[in-house]
Amino acid sequence: MLAEKMGAITLHCMPVASTPTRRGRPPGSSAARASNGAGSEAATAIPAGATPAMAQWFVLKNQHPDALLFFRMGDFYELFFQDAENAAATLDIQLTKRGLHEGEPIPMCGVPVHAAEMYLSRLIRRGWRVAIVEQMENPKNRAGKGPIRRDVVRLVTPGTITEETLLDAGRPNLLLAITQSGNRLGAAWLDISTGLFETESLDESGLTALLGRLDPAEILCPSSLHLEMWDARRGPEQPVSDPANARARLAEAYDVSHINVFGSFTDAEAMAAMQALDYVRDAQMGALPRLGHPVPVGEAGRLAMDASTRASLEIDRARDGGTERTLLSAVQRTLTPAGGRMLAAWLGAPLTDRTVITARQDGWGWLLEQPTLSMRLRETLRGCPDMARALGRIALGRGTPRDLAAIRDGAHIAMEAAGLLEGILPSALAELHAALHLPPDLPEMLEAALADPVPARIEDGGVIASGFDGELDAERGLRDDSRKVIAALQTEYAQRYGVASLKIRHHAQLGYMIEVPAVAVETLRTVPELILRQGMANGARFTHPDLSELDRRITEAAERARQREMIVITALRQKVEAHAGSIAACAEALARLDVLQSAARLAESGTWCRPVMTDDQTLTIEAGRHPVVEAALEGGPTPFMPNDTDLSASRRVMLLTGPNMAGKSTYLRQNALIVILAQAGLPVPARAAHIGIVDRLFSRVGASDDLARGQSTFMVEMTETAAILHQAGPRSLVVVDEIGRGTSTLDGLAIAWAVLEALHSRIGARTIFATHFHELARLQGELPMLRPYTMKVQEWRGKVVFLHEVAEGAGGRSWGVHVAKLAGVPAATVRRAGQLLTALEERSVGLTDNATLPLFAASHGNETETEPAEGIHEAKPASLPPELIEALGQMEPDKLTPREALDLMYHFKSMLSSQAHNGDVEAESW
């Protein structure tokens, strides 16, 4: 597993292919927007009379018409024309004017260079692409006249960002490229911040599931593909249409004879991978980041979940788009950013390979059995830096001193963790242990080289520690000695000129100056060697020939020290890059170790268990719980009610009835989430669990309309149901809620019945089918694998108590009027509803057997869906057990306490259920 990521390969620059015209996709972009958007000046010629700087702007804007141009001018990035108007509106900053263009003032806005990342973050999140234009020479040191040379140094797009402040520490930042070859799609996704690079071949029908699993920041794909809710993330179309050329260029990029050394790639996958690399290279102005080789992952080996299932289960995103009250938030005990990302990846792509699942379980299980070691390991991992992303920035030439420090600190943490894991280990931990060992000279060199603490920016100086480089120390000594001379001169000048308050200060534009108060100005004007340079409201500034010479010496020494420090820093970066593969593998090992300790921490409470994983179709859970709801209830007065689930071979379809608010939806979701956790290799919230590997998971719980696509709630429900019936198989798990609602009662009942039959008899999937159509419980005789269950309810003196407990048996009421009362429906309306319900129930007396419902001409299990049902199955007249008749005759209702009455009712129910199972009577659940 780790071997796939260990061998990070240095990419070689490849011939630059012709770059097609790009079309940026800011929010709400359209053809109309394009003519008035970021690129509206693309065809504008350089106007006569333009200043040299503005002439540069026009040239660069014509090269990057669809990006906002961050044009460096001194300490600001300036934006002009439509760029300025778009940026000012997005950033809520002031729009000003500068100069004229064709007789009109030029719109302008700007952001400070030191705060640019904050503004970039807001623009990128709104979907803009930004071209960064830097000054390519120092204004102070350049020779000759004319404008400062400027050029675009990079394009910042949602899928190609690397800055720590722009990235979400807990989520990958993926660029996804999709191409088409014949009837197959090829997808390639990469994260330049960590080096991840993977591909997959899929049908177009699997596209939304892929998008839901990856949640990419930016998508490159043909305009003919419909991305639905991800369309706002669509990047410029940049097609690659020659698979042979794509394979050859990929092989050249990785310096191999053929890309098949990395695995088997379809033509579409190869073209998608090359498209992604081209886009990244263009965004980095020809440079390529350190990327692992492309890994074809394929669809096999992962639990398949479509987009609606992911949304329904709120795995890592809640319905409101946030991350709270999700499965990830409920189980996360990771201590590092990389560990958080890996845990999210495990939950987003659970496995179907029992061997790999078991290896993960063995890893956290071993840590669980070593509590003292685990505690020390957590202390070691706490505060571990994000080595992978630091390495990515260093490889791109944008590494900061703190990125070098992150590699240093991460290496020390890895060494300490490796020391803790010495000895006999399970295979999962043994593999990690091997990857934690970096070449010892690397952390030693970084420890000796870097100052502590390191500054945030290289420009601030002081990155390299004293004593590491003799030449740098010498230049710093000259600079610092000259500064000591300045301090001595201040004392000498104050005494010589009789001005006790005289100060020598450095100014960015003037250099070192003598500053005196106003009362001393006239006296110093008469001193021949002093030259007045600047008057001030409260004094004046003078210079002196000796001071000017010292200023020159200090400036030159400081510049030599700066240049030498840059040489040393560059050497450190190169040393880090030389070990990039080992560092990347170490970073992944630390992340995996963090996930395993998180799982062990979760299991420490004793209320989470290690599920038994098998390749059969069993799915049994003892005292299972919904992890998110349980976490929300923690500390409150009401504990979560655990429930069992038994979908073993002889009872693999569970028909669940019961009232609203009784917990049906929670129960459905909790079983799906337990399967996800189990197949991610993690503990599950249950006393015990036996999970036969699920290949596809479908959750249709809680539907809503899709106004953007013009679909009603019922249409959305039917579309999702159709997907289940087409894609589910014998190894699938299907949890569905209220199939058939949103239409007439008979239509809904007919649809629910037909779907239930298909899942039971044709597909054979493990199924939990929640419904308010209580009549479906009568299908138990027709569908041998079906078992009815209901949510238990207690009623006393007109009040209903929902017990949130699943019990075997069929429910007879939905308690909708009681729920309406609890919801605050006016009392008069509730009373009227109760009267109408009573009347309707009385009218329906005698119409409750199958013979009186034409709909219940049940098809037999061996009939196909297209065959009409034949025959009406008569229900046998109900006969009460003699024991029950005798007990009723002896009962004295007026002498019973409420508790005795309730116990007696449950006893009667048990007697009825016992006879119902023998086929003599149908029992109604109380």
From Swiss-Prot:
Binding-site positions, ATP: 658-665
This protein's UniProt keywords: ATP-binding, DNA damage, DNA repair, DNA-binding, Nucleotide-binding
Molecular-function annotations in GO: ATP binding; ATP-dependent DNA damage sensor activity; damaged DNA binding; mismatched DNA binding
Compositionally biased region (Low complexity): 26-40
Region (Disordered): 16-40
InterPro entries named among the record's database cross-references: DNA_mismatch_repair_MutS (IPR005748), DNA_mismatch_repair_MutS-lik_N (IPR007695), DNA_mismatch_repair_MutS/MSH (IPR017261), DNA_mismatch_repair_MutS_C (IPR000432), DNA_mismatch_repair_MutS_clamp (IPR007861), DNA_mismatch_repair_MutS_core (IPR007696), DNA_mismatch_repair_MutS_N (IPR016151), DNA_mismatch_repair_MutS_sf (IPR036187)
Entry's Gene Ontology BP terms: mismatch repair
Similarity-based family: Belongs to the DNA mismatch repair MutS family.
Record's function text: This protein is involved in the repair of mismatches in DNA. It is possible that it carries out the mismatch recognition step. This protein has a weak ATPase activity.
Name listed for the protein in its UniProt record: DNA mismatch repair protein MutS
Organism from which the protein derives: Granulibacter bethesdensis (strain ATCC BAA-1260 / CGDNIH1)
Lineage summary: Bacteria, Pseudomonadati, Pseudomonadota, Alphaproteobacteria, Acetobacterales
Chain's gene name: mutS
